[in-house]
Amino acid sequence: MGFRPSGTRASASAAKHPCAPVILGVMLAGALTVPAPVAQAAQHPWAPPPVNSCGEIGFDPLNRAPDPNAPPPPPLPELPPQIDIPVPIPEITPVPVPDPAPDNTRIDPEPLPPDPCRNPCPDIRDTPKPPDPATEPKPSDPATETEPEIAPDTGSSSGSGSGSGSSSGSGALRLPRIAFRPEIEPVPIPVPGPDGIEPQPAPPPIVHPAEPGPLTAAIGPPLLESVELVGQVTGHGSANRTDMRWQVDGTDLGIMWETKPGEVAVAFGDTFGDGWTFGGVGGPDWRSNVLGYSTDHDLADGLSIDTMVQDSRCHATELLSSRKIKNWETTTIPTSGFAIGQRQFMSYMSVNHWSRIPGLWSTNYGGLAYSDDNGRTWVKDQYARWDNFFGLGRFQVTAMVPQGDYVYMFGTPNGRVGVIGLARVRKTEVLNKSAYQYWVGGTWAPAVENQATPLVVGMASELSVRFDKGSRQWQMVYLDSARGAIVMRTAASPQGAWTDGVQLVSTDDYPKAYGGFIHPWSTSEDLYFTISAWDSYNVYLMHAKLDPPH
């Protein structure tokens, strides 16, 4: 699932009333997930779908006109034949506590075959072979076929109330049936379970005195020369062939950081394997997150993934476990990553449940995990957590960036209707929550996190931030759901002043796009970043050509 899409534009009323009645929620969800009308944005000319070097057809996230040579689609009915109204049915769900220890089974995978079109594990997953004409059923003789019997039209249809499905048979509007669909709503109840994760020792409290953190002089925004889709990173038809190599058919995000010189980690969100189908999230072989590695320096022709962390042959494993229980912990989603010395860190959010309204979700907390074996296994720190009390936590979805003596933490609340806050911590104390200083009105203060001053005006989500050593400037990319765009800002210091947002990607051009995660080897002139598209539920590499201010 990663981050749920925001549709084409965010709904202000949805942001103000997240607890609206179920029917209103369903109506809003339907409205927000409908693509923008054609009148809002011209479609790009039709083009055949992309094909990788093995002849496999991939996905094109661009908003294109339909194939002019294809037969016209059947007309849509004026009204659906049935409207389903979900009815929550509470169900007591025992949840053993503490959490079970993670399964850290890992293998050292064999190198990929030299031939990129050769599947590394054909005994597990192989390219479907075309049907054998000799075994195909022969068409029957039309002369011997009989017409199917058609039931007589009574001129009426059953409904939930008198006349709700009536029709005179003379072309009158047929009203849809109303059906109430039971939907299990788990009510988690903690119960004692077997021994699980051992408690960790608490770090000593550290409170650093307040220090000045004034705004730096504003810089001019870069001029955007061009933005182009470089290529599909994951899924069927991608150059990486992640479906055949690692059972990654559908996934999202693609959060990147440098693990060591010459290597970049790529973290993905909710991932599904063989059996996933086009149309969004869900499917077999659900893993909350997976991790790949890349040494590809030439991004102009795409992002190559060399390998992934695996628990068995050709199977990318889940790194940060989750309980997968709605209203307790549905999933755990990476939000950023960074390295300090030999240790890797990953920020993540523990998702309590996804909302019926796109762009909204509830978290339990935002947390930090670390790895001392270059990302093969991870430990969730039990104290470096920012709890989401009453849904008001400001640092639930974070992007963390080491620079100088500090690690800077940019954060937003759960969902896509919050503002950006900022904190910092010394590198040696990154797992000690009490050592963090929050940027409050020009001061680095040992304050309560909710007092952090918003960095910029407006809503933001899915932050990605990097410090560009060449220009000595900060780059920040995020989804502005109110604007319906992935935007970029720059600043001379993490607290700003930040430039106005420069639009990189519009959801008019890339419907239901989200993300915007910067490749760490970008520059002030060449910005490479990943986006996700909801319906094809996979990751794409984008390239923005910039003209920075001189």
Task: Show the residue positions of the predicted features.
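Hydrophobic core segments of beta-strands in well-ordered, beta-rich domains
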Residues: 257-259, 263-277, 333-359, 397-415, ...
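Blade-level signature of beta-propeller repeat domains, shared across WD40, Kelch, NHL, RCC1
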Residues: 516-550
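Secretory targeting and sorting signals
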Residues: 1-41
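Loop/turn-rich, solvent-exposed surfaces of beta-rich toroidal or solenoidal domains
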Residues: 5, 456-493
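Conserved blade-ending motifs and adjacent loop-strand segments that build the rim/top face
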Residues: 5-18, 245-246, 495-522
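N-terminal regions that are enriched for targeting/export leaders
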Residues: 5, 38, 43-335, 339-340, ...
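Blade-edge beta-strand/turn elements of extracellular beta-propeller
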Residues: 220-243, 311-324, 373-391, 433-455, ...
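Beta-propeller blade signature
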Residues: 280-303, 360-376, 421-428, 488-494, ...
